UniProtKB/Swiss-Prot annotation:
InterPro entries attached to this UniProt entry: AAA+_ATPase (IPR003593), ABC_transporter-like_ATP-bd (IPR003439), ABC_transporter-like_CS (IPR017871), ABC_transpr_CbiO/EcfA_su (IPR015856), ECF_ABC_transporter_ATP-bd (IPR050095), EcfA_1 (IPR030947), P-loop_NTPase (IPR027417)
Taxonomic source organism: Levilactobacillus brevis (strain ATCC 367 / BCRC 12310 / CIP 105137 / JCM 1170 / LMG 11437 / NCIMB 947 / NCTC 947) (Lactobacillus brevis)
Protein name listed in UniProt: Energy-coupling factor transporter ATP-binding protein EcfA1
Similarity comment: family membership: Belongs to the ABC transporter superfamily. Energy-coupling factor EcfA family.
Encoding gene, per UniProt annotation: ecfA1
Domain of life: Bacteria
Annotated compartments: Cell membrane
Length: 279
């Protein structure tokens, strides 16, 4: 049986006592080594949930357990040792004068010796394809390059869990593809548990499992293919449909009957080729 690396039980968070809760009675588990996507429209509460997992926002009710440690004010730093987090805007995360200084920052905070720090920084930059930018100022980089540097900083400290909080939302399509490809590779190499907070349904397709948050509540949980088959239900919650589902809808409008189950881009391409060859 797969071990749960995170357990969230009846979590509620309220920014102000005069406001409705941003999260209400949310419970779920995260399996060690899995990729979990948490999707929802803007303002649904998904980023509040992400920040609650490592104590950035102290929840009002409920409990969070990470790696067997229950999150409390006394244990928050033990929990954070296990988690690396990348946010939407990489500029808000940079503290170093150069790329390599920034990647080294987390190691310096952990009082890692320079003899150990230098090779770890070099290895982290190599893993994200940023070795040649080590001496550059972070401000001179593109958005995609900045997120790679932020990811290198996480790789260097070697956490068990990586949280991407809308980390690809400010990237162009190619930058998004490249970033997710690097995350997939790192996950395999380091047995990372990945939690992706996103409103991008195509990004959620990379996950093993998807949670849907709507108005602060967990309203659905399933594998991506089952979630994407919800169709109009996703649209009603302010989410987009995956490209392949849009394509299937367009085919139906033209009198063509596509597969009824969710198809990845590769599967849809194969189906189209077979359909064309049979006509």
């Amino acid at each position: 049986m797969t071990e749960n690396i995170i357990s969230v039980d009846h979590l509620t968070y309220q920014y102000d006592e005069n406001q409705a809760p941003a999260l209400t009675d949310v419970s779920f588990t995260v399996h060690a080594g899995e990729w979990l996507a948490i999707v929802g429209h803007n303002g649904s509460g998904k980023s509040t949930l992400a920040k609650s997992l490592d104590g950035l926002l102290p929840f009002t009710q409920g409990s969070v357990t990470v790696g067997g440690i229950t999150l409390t004010p006394e244990t928050v730093w033990q929990v954070r040792e296990q988690i690396g987090m990348i946010f939407q805007n990489p500029d808000n995360q940079f503290v170093g004068a150069t790329v390599e200084d920034d990647v080294a920052f987390g190691l310096e905070n952990r009082q890692i010796s320079r003899d150990e720090m230098v090779p770890r920084v070099q290895a982290a930059l190599a893993q994200v394809g940023m070795t040649s930018f080590a001496q550059r100022e972070p401000s001179s980089l593109s958005g995609g390059q900045k997120q790679r540097v932020a990811l290198a900083g996480i790789v260097a400290i070697a956490p068990k869990i990586l949280i991407l909080d809308e980390a690809t939302s400010m990237l162009d399509p190619q930058g998004r593809i490249e970033m997710l490809a690097i995350v997939r590779q790192l996950r395999q190499q380091q047995n990372l548990t990945v939690i992706s907070i996103t409103h991008d349904i195509d990004e959620a397709a990379s996950a093993d499992r998807v949670l849907v948050i709507d108005d602060g509540r967990l309203v659905d949980e399933a594998v991506p293919s089952q979630i994407f088959e919800r169709g109009t239900q996703l649209v009603e919650m302010g989410l987009d449909l995956p490209f392949t589902e849009k394509l299937k809808a367009a085919l139906r409008q033209r009198g063509i009957t596509p597969p009824t189950t969710y198809q990845t881009a590769a599967e849809m391409e194969e189906w189209l080729w077979q359909s064309l060859s049979n006509t």
